[in-house]
Amino acid sequence: MTEQYYKIALLFNANKVYDRQVVEGIGQYIQASQCMWDIFVEDEFIYHTDTINQLSIDGIIADFDDPKTVELLQHTLIPTIAVGGSYKQADFYPHFPYIATDNMALVEMALSHLQEKGLSQFAFYGLQVNTHKHWSIERRDAFVELMEKNHYPIYLYEGVQVHAQNWLEEQQKLIVWLKSLPSHTGIIAVTDARARHLLQACEYSKIAVPEELCVVGIDNEELIQYLSRMSLSSVEQGTREIGYQAAKLLHKLLNGQKVSHTPILIPPITVHSRNSTDYRSLTDPLVIQAMHYIRHRACHRIKVGQVLDHLETSRSNLEQRFKNEMNKTIHQVIHEEKISRAKNLLQQTDISIKEITEICGYPSIQYFYSVFKKEFEMTPKEFRLNC
């Protein structure tokens, strides 16, 4: 029996990384199942409200975090699968089958990551309460619940939407809050975009990350990684799995099978640990200052002498402090920062090895190969191929 063709509308805004990855997951299901679907998306990947009315649509998968989508589809009789963020209150879910990112699990994973780094003070940077962004409220409430459950003090800051007119004012307010936090606090940002605000504010106000404050975001958005000097640790959501499961449910509906309306919660995948949470339990203020200087300048071919000049201290004094705090020499730490930067660039970018050699401050590609192979027992090229 030949399977019927169906015209399917995907109502997503592909300018958002969450939506793009959900759509990728839908595509993965279509490829895997070979279902006979004719997918409709707008050319600019932003749907318009008259889409449903103008086309003979057989099925819909839609982003129900968007209030316009909820309003458009609330009375539709077309088979529909909703995706979005989870709710603590079950009656908040729509009357459609629903695939959700698990907001509590996202915050729990971020918190566990910070705890594993040795931190014991935590804060949350979110958005001011807005019913149109319920996922922000749910993540904030999850953080508060976890703090109360574990008897931690609660540090919260909720920023407004930022635009050119209020950017400097809002950054100053954020800096005031950051300076009020206890030293060695781990901050969970509601999104990677908000995490970037934190990194900018810390750099502007000379707060050392991760020595004084650590930052972890949510989304693992590739674009954000390129917009900050400090690489951002982030929780990767199971967005492709959300799309895959949504398409699978719609396929069942179209084939006349019964589908449960109990929301399916998809957990996050992992935390991508990067420099913003590369915390070491340092207590010596001079070592903290030195580490901050080294992190930002190791690839500028700095020598130990430049670190000493910056801190206006003697080599014997600082070397002893490094030995007491880290059991390492200053030179070892500079080397580690350079090689770590090179490793991350090999893993996360397509930049040529020659260019990475220059970026990381190695005098020649031959020297870089020698140092890298000694550290990892493989060449940079072999390392990249194995990533």
From Swiss-Prot:
<dbReference type="InterPro" id="IPR018060">
    <property type="entry name" value="HTH_AraC"/>
</dbReference>
<dbReference type="Pfam" id="PF12833">
    <property type="entry name" value="HTH_18"/>
</dbReference>
<keyword id="KW-0804">Transcription</keyword>
<feature type="DNA-binding region" description="H-T-H motif">
    <location>
        <begin position="305"/>
        <end position="326"/>
    </location>
</feature>
<dbReference type="InterPro" id="IPR028082">
    <property type="entry name" value="Peripla_BP_I"/>
</dbReference>
<comment type="function">
    <text>Regulatory protein for the xylBAFGHR operon.</text>
</comment>
<dbReference type="GO" id="GO:0006355">
    <property type="term" value="P:regulation of DNA-templated transcription"/>
</dbReference>
<protein>
    <recommendedName>
        <fullName>Xylose operon regulatory protein</fullName>
    </recommendedName>
</protein>
<keyword id="KW-0238">DNA-binding</keyword>
<dbReference type="InterPro" id="IPR054031">
    <property type="entry name" value="XylR_PBP1"/>
</dbReference>
<dbReference type="GO" id="GO:0000976">
    <property type="term" value="F:transcription cis-regulatory region binding"/>
</dbReference>
<dbReference type="Pfam" id="PF22177">
    <property type="entry name" value="PBP1_XylR"/>
</dbReference>
<dbReference type="InterPro" id="IPR046335">
    <property type="entry name" value="LacI/GalR-like_sensor"/>
</dbReference>
<dbReference type="InterPro" id="IPR018062">
    <property type="entry name" value="HTH_AraC-typ_CS"/>
</dbReference>
<dbReference type="GO" id="GO:0003700">
    <property type="term" value="F:DNA-binding transcription factor activity"/>
</dbReference>
<dbReference type="InterPro" id="IPR020449">
    <property type="entry name" value="Tscrpt_reg_AraC-type_HTH"/>
</dbReference>
<feature type="DNA-binding region" description="H-T-H motif">
    <location>
        <begin position="353"/>
        <end position="376"/>
    </location>
</feature>
<dbReference type="InterPro" id="IPR009057">
    <property type="entry name" value="Homeodomain-like_sf"/>
</dbReference>
<dbReference type="Pfam" id="PF13377">
    <property type="entry name" value="Peripla_BP_3"/>
</dbReference>
<feature type="domain" description="HTH araC/xylS-type">
    <location>
        <begin position="288"/>
        <end position="386"/>
    </location>
</feature>
<keyword id="KW-0805">Transcription regulation</keyword>
